[in-house]
């Protein structure tokens, strides 16, 4: 068998080579088998054992449709030092479930899983991988469906290929950290890039929706790339982690697909180099200096307009860690679990600048445990390419579940779109017109020498 460092498993023919227990294949996806029209409550799928080039790191991805009351759990094991490890779980997963990564290790501590990455410290590295996915439901009328499984390893002796030169530029929306939710800090870079990759295909999803749909509850961060790929899969996009060389990147751009790439570089305010995510949107050649360059979207730029940047190819290959996330166009037949958007109205409260959500005439107040993002965007008369390009101004939650607008907006008045994304990625959306304050009446009190108002006194 040819050894490849990136494996992507999808489709009926590929999945049928593994072992299905209480599962069936339906429209190319793994689903729970059924008896008399009722789904079984539990089932599992185990892939064949795959030989891999000796590796030090392993990343696993999955794309699944998991309706309410269903769950997916992906596990892996590694062949190293002449034996297979025990199964290691990446945590139970569903769009509406509080996702938490799990840490585990082998008995000798030489192979361990932390977050989204399995590290093999054993001499000679790992040489084999096997995946397993467990499906479960608490409702025999619904079943989860797994559409894609992927495994990517970083070889110990990686002979990186360059491929053929390519001159192609792709459109990729520009989003920067400073214009979006600051709750996650610099780690908001990955949700920004993932939103851009999907919005390139017309999704129009907010980075904040992506962030809360992929948040790792164990670290309260958005740095888990397995959850990032799963979040994109929820929206119907085939998406997986990969360890790529220049040939792989050029093939993705050649096929018209932008890629999320991890680079190591210095950023403002950081003493040591940090790893951050950028969007790769093309390659080019500068005839003036006879050099190749890459086209990137850097979310750490100061403004949306400064996100597009270029970098010499030799510099990019020095900073590129090899870790990437590939995303392909949405398939029409794929069921989607994209974060819910609830169309609401806003009702003015008794306190100045406080409004309350209503849905279909019923109160839809923000719950006490709300820990998401609330913002509003003014209607500025500009046709923005995506909703995420609008200018967002932060609002706050009141103690009784309302939305408090900042004083400067109340002073300006006008029409606004209001967004409240909760910790599951579900978003309330409403429109409101803030009344413009009445101008202060001109003073009519008599002044010196019989003058009134603001007219100057005559000498």
Language-model features: locations:
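Beta-strand-rich ligand- or partner-binding modules
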Residues: 1-169
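Noncatalytic regulatory segments and standalone regulatory/sensor domains
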Residues: 5-19, 24, 50-53, 124-139, ...
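Conserved active-site-adjacent core of cysteine acyl-enzyme catalytic domains
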Residues: 38, 209-333, 399
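Recognizes extended acidic, P/S/T-rich segments that occur
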Residues: 105-110, 371-410
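Surface-exposed, short loops/turns at beta-strand junctions within beta-sandwich domains
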Residues: 121-126, 407-413
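Active-site-adjacent structural segments surrounding the nucleophilic cysteine of cysteine proteases
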Residues: 134-220, 354-359, 385-391, 396-401, ...
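Extracellular fibronectin type III
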Residues: 425-436
